[in-house]
């Protein structure tokens, strides 16, 4: 699967306000390097980006439940037995991938889990599964997250989880569900052990590309090019900027004509719109240069 993914530690948050830290300015130049970046949600990936874990002490769930007390109806006893059997299957599945020392599924187990599900750790389906499991951090499922997640999607085995993927992907297309997934993704990308409050710029680029897999905004490529070139010298993406970008894609048209700096947008959006409009202007001027030369030659031929 390639190199083990790692995290950039302690990025400085510069966004969500008008006074972010800046690096050296660079000339406007369109870049597409963000298109080659991938981020692994569970295990190893082809490009080093980000992996983190949470502190030990996560609350554990009991693997089994007591049988129904005497006096219950036969139907209730059968239902309890079926529920117990499902819990046992989830327990067996959890133990198949859990770490030898910690009561959680960690990097190696997550990679085997993804392999058995026939999914790549860098793909959208893994992010959706982490969302349904309400995973607190990348590359880790605690016992509680795994048990509650399997119950939430009504699956207790590999085949059952695989069978749920189509409906989970359809669910993620719903506007309210996608908004929840989108906001989850920001928290999911933070390093909880380091107390991060902002996403490192490169991590944010990878996560934006991933979370918009099914409903890509028309302006996304330009936004990611802007962040990759980084003319404003930003170092981190705040929660406010992350959340507001979804609103930006829904309210502002791809031609950016209805964008107003007077509205309460993060200052980074002001810089982006200015950068993008300048880029488009330069692109049009470049196209007109050969046209102008052709017209001059045509005029000389007529005379």
UniProtKB/Swiss-Prot annotation:
Free-text function comment from the UniProt entry: Contributes to the neddylation of all cullins by transferring NEDD8 from N-terminally acetylated NEDD8-conjugating E2s enzyme to different cullin C-terminal domain-RBX complexes. At the cell membrane, can promote and as well inhibit cullins neddylation.
Span of domain DCUN1: 85-277
Description of how the protein assembles with itself and partners: May interact (via the DCUN1 domain) with unneddylated cullins.
Molecular function per GO: cullin family protein binding
UniProt-listed PROSITE patterns: DCUN1 (PS51229)
Domain notes: The DCUN1 domain, also known as PONY domain, mediates the interaction with different cullins.
Source superkingdom: Eukaryota
Segments for region (Disordered): 1-41, 62-83, 284-303
Keyword field: Cell membrane, Cytoplasm, Lipoprotein, Membrane, Myristate, Nucleus
Polar residues composition bias: residue spans: 294-303
InterPro entries in the cross-refs: DCN-prot (IPR014764), DCN1-like_PONY (IPR042460), PONY_dom (IPR005176)
Covalent lipid adducts (N-myristoyl glycine), residues: 2
Listed name of the protein: DCN1-like protein 3
One Pfam family named in its UniProt record: Cullin_binding
């Amino acid at each position: 699967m390639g190199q083990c993914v790692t995290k950039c530690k302690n990025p400085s948050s510069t966004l969500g306000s008008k006074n972010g830290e800046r690096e050296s300015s660079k000339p406007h130049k369109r870049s597409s390097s963000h298109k080659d970046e991938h981020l692994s949600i569970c295990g190893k990936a082809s490009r080093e980006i980000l992996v983190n874990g949470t502190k030990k002490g996560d609350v554990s769930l009991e693997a089994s439940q007591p049988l129904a007390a005497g006096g219950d109806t036969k139907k209730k006893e059968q239902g309890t037995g079926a529920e117990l059997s499902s819990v046992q299957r989830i327990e067996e599945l959890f133990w198949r991938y859990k770490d030898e020392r910690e009561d959680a599924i960690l990097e190696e187990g997550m990679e085997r889990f993804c392999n058995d599900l026939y999914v790549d750790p860098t793909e959208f389906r893994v992010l959706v599964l982490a969302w349904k499991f309400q995973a607190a951090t990348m590359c880790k499922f605690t016992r509680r997250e795994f048990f509650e997640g399997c119950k939430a999607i009504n699956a207790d085995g590999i085949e059952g989880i695989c069978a749920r993927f189509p409906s989970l992907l359809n669910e993620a297309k719903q506007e309210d569900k996608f908004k929840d997934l989108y906001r989850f993704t920001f928290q999911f990308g933070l390093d909880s052990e380091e107390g991060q409050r902002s996403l490192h710029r490169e991590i944010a680029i990878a996560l934006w590309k991933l979370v918009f897999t099914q409903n890509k905004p028309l302006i996304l490529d330009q936004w990611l090019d802007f962040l990759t070139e980084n003319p404003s010298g930003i170092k981190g993406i705040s929660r406010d900027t992350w959340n507001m970008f979804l609103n930006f894609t829904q309210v502002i048209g791809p031609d950016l004509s209805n964008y107003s700096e007077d509205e309460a947008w993060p200052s980074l959006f002001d810089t982006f719109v200015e950068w993008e409009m300048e880029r488009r202007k330069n692109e049009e001027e470049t196209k007109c240069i050969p046209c102008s030369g052709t017209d001059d030659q045509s005029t000389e031929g007529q005379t």
